[in-house]
């Protein structure tokens, strides 16, 4: 029980440090027209993430992430290559997601999202990075996009985590679709 309490205290301290670092104003979110993402937290308890992939190149897959029906940020993944580890984006479908504490350095922790139960894959994360070289099969987030890249990844990741924590941080569901 003491170990659990220590872990929870460390987790809360990491969250508070992340929130203090990123008290920045960001632009209002826009509504999504896809009915799948329009479920409000009162209808389905928890957080509903919808990732719609819309740009496909040989180097990357770029999409848009919606949180509880509101457009939130851009995403970048590897192109789909038969769901191969470290070089392919994950298959479209429905997944459970949970918050995961990651140690960035000896003095600094941060949170990222772990996508669970991906067939033949493990440790698929939402995390910071700007190009497909940074992803290794994970999902990168950013505010703004270029060809095969997303921008302002650190700020975008912090805002995603902050929004998920504001919505309760539990029962996180992810739906991935190709446009």
Mark where each language-model region is.
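Cell wall/extracellular polymer interaction/catalysis modules
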Residues: 2-172, 178-179
């Amino acid at each position: 029980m003491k170990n659990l309490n220590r872990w929870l205290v460390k987790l809360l301290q990491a969250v508070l440090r992340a929130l203090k670092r990123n008290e920045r104003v960001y632009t209002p979110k826009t509504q999504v027209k896809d009915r799948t993402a329009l479920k409000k937290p009162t209808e389905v308890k928890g957080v509903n993430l919808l990732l719609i992939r819309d740009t496909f190149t040989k180097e990357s897959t770029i999409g848009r992430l919606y949180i509880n029906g509101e457009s939130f940020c851009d995403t970048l993944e590897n192109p789909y290559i038969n769901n191969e580890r470290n070089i392919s984006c994950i298959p479209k479908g429905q997944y459970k997601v949970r918050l995961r504490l990651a140690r960035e350095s000896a003095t600094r922790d941060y949170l990222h999202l772990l996508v669970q139960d991906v067939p033949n894959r493990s440790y698929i994360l939402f995390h910071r990075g700007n190009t497909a070289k940074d992803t290794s099969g994970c999902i990168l987030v950013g505010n703004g996009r270029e060809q095969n890249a997303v921008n302002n990844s650190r700020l975008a990741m912090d805002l995603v985590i902050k929004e998920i924590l504001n919505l309760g941080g539990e029962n996180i569901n992810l739906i991935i679709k190709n446009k």
